[in-house]
Amino acid sequence: MYAQQLELFELFNPNPIKTSRSQLTFVDLFAGIGGFRIPLEELGCKCLGYSEIDKKAIQTYRDNFIKDANSDEVYLGDITNLNQLPFPIDVLVGGVPCQPWSIAGKMQGLDDPRGKLWTDVFRVVTANRPKAFIFENVKGLTEPRNIESLKYIINNLTSSGYVVKYEVLNSYDFGLPQDRDRMFIVGIRNDLERCWGFTFPKPIEGAIKLYDVIPGIQRSNFRKQKFSPTVLFDGKIPGSRGRFQKLDELNDFFLFTDIRDGHTTIHSWDLIETTSREKLICQTIMKNRRKNIYGEKDGNPLQFKVLATLIPELKQTEIDNLVDKEILRSVDDKGYDFVNSKISSGINGISKIFLPHADAIATLTATGTRDFVATISIQCQEPLAYKETFIREIYQKKNFQPLTAQDYAKLQGFPEWFKIYENETTAKHQLGNAVSIPVVYHLAKALLENIL
């Protein structure tokens, strides 16, 4: 299984770049658990030192990379204390802390102390003048609200004497079944002959499914049924469709939430015994709670008197019954809203369940996930039957499993020899923070060809 994955993105069967000159060297900044180091070493580069301050990440890093043969490799400590390195280097790499621009963080940008670590990056680059660098961050840094911060970063690196380019790359395009967008900033020193020659790698050919990577789930060769947009969307295609949500197919995952609707959306009233009347009440609340007429928030509690205008002959006891079933809740004196009113929280601890034949799972994060993977596949049928079959055969029979830390490692492209941290939660945190190995492999390969 894993060999098939490696063959797909050509990792660990690489053709290391050969040079008659000395081996290219690099320093691993914000080293984490070594996501940059693995592909660079596979490409024939040598690590001279690493910088990291998280003690548990350092333990994982040392367990995997520091052996008798390189026991004298330099631990560089905290980047805030770095200036001139004790040796010349060819390449600087690092995943600069991304929380300041991450949706999962508070998006404070350069106002966040972690965002200010870029000034340490500028200082180390200027002091050491490597031939090139690769820095990784979240896609959020490229979005309009952060464009001034991005310009500031690019301008500082350019003024240090580098030709700088950036691009967002997705892990799926490089052989992993994970929908993970990350921005990479690449710079080549402007006195080098091929400083303008670098171009970002193109997506590799081939496709991979979750069942190719995650053990214990069913492989299938179901041919997906096609539908017209009129059938799927009643002629109104949503504007927020993701990359892996096709316009003529049912989704390969089911979303658990009470505040959105769709053919593959599971609501609490689908899972709890409810009458058709109760379902109607819930659907009415769901369709109206986001309307501006009822408040400025993106989702407002609705008072009984409002609901009574929307639902004929509504009785207070009907609302009370839904409160007793823990589908609705009373919000102070503002009215009624769903108990499960946040998409990120899901229902019963489940946000999404992906089918084994899905092209990609959602982005893995350091804060964990409420995403699960079904252990069996179901045939794509007409929309209502598809949802009913999922609830009956997968949800009710518990034919789904959480992602393990080992699953995280595989979904990030880490090799089987890699030793993950012994604590499951910590291991997931570390792997969710890491770069995807095959993305860096193909990116670094394209870069090294221009600095030899």
Language-model features, listed with the residues they occupy:
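Proline-centered helix-kink/hinge sites
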Residues: 96-97, 130, 177, 415
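Short, solvent-exposed loop/turn segments at secondary-structure junctions
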Residues: 34, 55, 97-99, 139-140, ...
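Class I S-adenosyl-L-methionine
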Residues: 82-89, 104-354
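C-terminal target-recognition/interaction regions appended to catalytic cores
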Residues: 2-3, 8, 254-452
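Conserved beta-strand scaffold positions in the cores of enzyme catalytic domains, especially
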Residues: 26, 50, 74-75, 164-166, ...
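A generic secondary-structure signal for well-formed alpha-helical elements
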Residues: 65, 96, 142-145, 157-161, ...
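Core alpha/beta nucleotide-donor-binding catalytic domains of modification enzymes
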Residues: 2-129, 135, 139-151
